[in-house]
From Swiss-Prot:
Compartment(s) of residence: Cytoplasm, Cytoskeleton, Microtubule organizing center, Spindle pole body
KW Coiled coil (keyword) present: yes
GO cellular component terms attached to this protein's record: cytoplasm; spindle pole body
Functional summary from the UniProt entry: Component of the spindle pole body (SPB) required for insertion of the nascent SPB into the nuclear envelope and for the proper execution of spindle pole body (SPB) duplication. Connects the central plaque of the SPB with the half-bridge. Required for proper localization of CDC5 at the SPB and for proper M-phase progression.
Region entry Disordered, spans: 50-71, 87-123
Name of the protein in its database record: Spindle pole component BBP1
Keyword flag Ribosomal protein: no
Species the sequence originates in: Zygosaccharomyces rouxii (strain ATCC 2623 / CBS 732 / NBRC 1130 / NCYC 568 / NRRL Y-229)
Length: 362
């Protein structure tokens, strides 16, 4: 057997070149049938897996014989590198909940083979690191839960019947198949609901766009109003500043006028006092003037009386003189003219009368 492997894998010639070319183009894939033949011969046939099972026997674990129920265990296929049966895979209850392989032709985990010469050029056959892997919907997804809401109790009953099924040695039952159900109406209902939801989302989206446009218009109007209000506020602030400046100027003038008015009040009081004093003085002067006028009037009256008396005396004196002259003329009529020098020699001449007359004239 070992010589055959050497001949197939490492020997030269056309067969080795063909094998190397096939491995380089399509990858070295070992057929699972050969491994299955190795494990299916006998329980004691270990061959190249001696070291693998020695540790398990050291730990006290015994290897069980495969039976008809081993095909239902997924670990059986994983342990022996076997492909699962399509029937069992399609009959599993949770197959629709499992992840969907977007690259069914590519291996689940790419194996880096040193003999794969053209492995870098087969990127379309293998999964790349940038490929978005599909994630299965969760159990609480509304669509999945609605689709399988009628299937859950049946699934539980089937699980209970599977758990309670007796394991009879040597029996080869057929894989359990659930009753086929037609979910076309439910799919159509879900699709209609999705269509309605899509239209509702379009309406919501349209409403959101309208609200967004309305909000933009409102923001624009608010912005314009804000700018107008800001300009008005700036003008009002400028006017207020001018008003306050003028107010402070007027207040300063008011303070000055108040001080001046205070001084004016003091001066007015002084003027009033002076006016009162002046009035009193004027009254006194008027009284004095009145007294002086009265005295002057009395003096004038006395002067007039004296003048009238003097005039009367003068008239009396003149009449007296005239009488005396007539008397003298009548008494003495000389043959020759008589001078006044000779009158002093008259015996009846009174000099005191003339003296008194002269004083009255002065």
């Amino acid at each position: 057997m070992s010589s055959e492997q050497v001949d197939e894998n490492t020997s030269g010639g056309i067969h080795g070149l063909y094998r190397w070319t096939m491995d380089a183009l399509f990858g070295s894939r070992v057929s699972p049938s050969r491994k299955y033949r190795e494990f299916a011969q006998d329980d004691t046939n270990y061959k190249s897996r001696d070291e693998l099972f020695k540790g398990s026997y050291k730990d006290g674990n015994s290897r069980g014989r495969s039976n008809s129920w081993s095909g239902l265990d997924p670990n059986f296929y994983r342990r022996h590198d076997l492909l699962p049966l399509e029937e069992s895979q399609s009959s599993s209850k949770s197959s629709l909940m499992d992840p969907v392989d977007l690259h069914p032709r590519a291996p689940a985990s790419p194996v880096l083979d040193t003999t794969d010469t053209f492995g870098a050029k087969k990127g379309s056959w293998r999964r790349s690191e940038s490929t978005i892997e599909f994630k299965s919907p969760s159990a609480d997804d509304p669509v999945v839960s609605r689709l399988f809401e009628k299937r859950k109790p049946r699934h539980k009953e089937n699980v209970i019947t599977q758990r309670l099924a007796p394991q009879i040695p040597g029996k080869f039952p057929s894989p359990v198949k659930g009753p086929s159900s037609d979910y076309t109406s439910e799919y159509l209902e879900i699709l209609n609901q999705l269509d309605r939801n899509g239209r509702a989302l379009q309406e919501v989206n349209r409403g959101l766009w309208e609200r967004c446009e309305q909000r933009q218009r409102q923001e624009k109007s608010y912005r314009d109003s804000y700018r107008e209000t800001r300009a008005e506020l700036i003008n009002e602030l400028k006017q207020s500043r001018k008003l306050y400046d003028n107010y402070y100027k007027l207040y300063g003038k008011y303070q000055q006028l108040k001080a001046i008015s205070k001084e004016t009040l003091d001066l007015q009081s002084k003027v009033n006092n002076l006016e009162s004093e002046l009035v009193d003085t004027a009254i006194k002067k008027e009284k004095q003037i009145h007294d002086l006028h009265k005295q002057l009037f009395q003096a004038e009256l006395r002067a007039q009386e004296a003048e009238s008396r003097r005039q009367r005396d003068a008239i009396a004196y003149e009449s007296r003189i005239a009488d005396l002259q007539r008397q003298l003329e009548n008494r003495y009529r000389p043959s020759s003219p008589v001078s006044y020098r000779d009158q002093s020699t008259l015996s009846d001449y009174n000099a005191s009368v003339d003296t008194q007359f002269l004083k009255n004239l002065v």
